[in-house]
Amino acid sequence: EILGVLGIARDMTDTKKLEQQIRNSEKLASVGKLAAGVAHEINNPLGGILNCLYNMRKGTLSPSRQEEYLASMEDGLRRVQRIVRQLLDFSQQHNPELALADINQVVNRVLLLTDHLFVPHRVQLETALSPDIPELMIDRHMMEQVLMNLVLNAIQAMRTGGVLTIRTSMDEAHCLVRIQDSGCGISSSVLPRIFDPFFTTKPAGQGTGLGLSVSYGIVKDHGGEIRLESEEGVGTTFIITLPGQVQAA
């Protein structure tokens, strides 16, 4: 016999707004980490362009040499343009929007923005991106944020340099993205808390403790999962599993 019915309704609007604000603040934190290096990356081609202009103004260059200088200047400007566009696109706030996207292109966009960090941190990059992955139904901007956070964390974990390996592959109906570093590793005692909000193993002032929590939420929103394998003194591997999306013929 049914004696009554209890109904509970919760307005999740404020919660969703807070989640979005946290994601945006974490994205801005990543942009801050990138800014100085991106400025250096832009300054190099600009210096080359100024040098070309200086030599061309002398009026002593042969026509063929002038063409070489003009081509070099154009290449430098296009590189600056590409970097600025990528950074602006990454930093802007976007409404969540699922669409078919190439996960390998998402990986490469993140690597383009972080490329300038590898040499000064003595990090060797290795990639193995499978060409057999179908386009996935994802929010490209959110997945860029997840991968950006994991790449930046990996670089920070390799204090004396090391190898960063990024792999993509298919496992039956799922896409796997692996981000592996040869850094300091994570103690087994803190592994259960690694995705908790505000938990960080970094020194005070060097991390918000939100990056992995935000990444966890984004991957979950995509119907996927994120886990890690780590051993102190050996390194850490983050494994993202996303539902495969096969396009209709």
Give names to the regions the model predicted.
Residues 1-5:
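Short loop/turn elements at sensory-signaling interfaces that couple input to output
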Residues 16-28, 33:
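Sensory-domain boundary/capping and coupling elements
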